[in-house]
């Protein structure tokens, strides 16, 4: 399975260990470099999406509109970054635009620097 940075995939985030961790089967943005994505590395870094929208929540969240197989407008949860095993990827839904991916990086930098 070929997974690329900026793609939105349906992933299995169960089980979770804490109440404040996102679980379920849900969409997520691949945020790992393609150098690692296209290697034999066993995990990928993702940012989960939520359809429970919160207006004005930047830099914690970034809104994206529905597209392709992503059926609802969603918020990318910037602060819920995590690595998941490659076996947790179910199917590709869509991808971010170059501008959206750039904005994700800006928001990620804002909450981590």
Give the location of each predicted region:
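Short, charged beta-turn/beta-strand-edge "cap" motif at the junction between a beta-strand
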Residues: 14-18
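C-terminal terminal-subdomain/extension
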Residues: 1, 66-113
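Compact nucleic-acid interaction/catalytic patches
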Residues: 19-25, 29-66
């Amino acid at each position: 399975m070929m997974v690329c940075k900026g793609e939105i995939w349906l992933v299995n985030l169960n089980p979770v260990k804490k109440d404040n961790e996102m679980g379920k089967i849900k969409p997520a943005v691949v945020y790992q470099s393609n150098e690692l994505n296209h290697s034999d590395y066993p995990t990928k870094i993702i940012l989960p999406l939520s359809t429970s929208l919160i207006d004005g929540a930047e830099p914690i969240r970034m809104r994206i509109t529905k597209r392709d197989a992503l059926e609802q407008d969603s918020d990318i949860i910037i602060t819920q970054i995590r690595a998941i095993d490659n076996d947790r990827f179910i199917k590709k839904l869509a991808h971010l635009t170059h501008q959206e991916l750039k904005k994700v990086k800006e928001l990620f930098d804002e909450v981590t620097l």
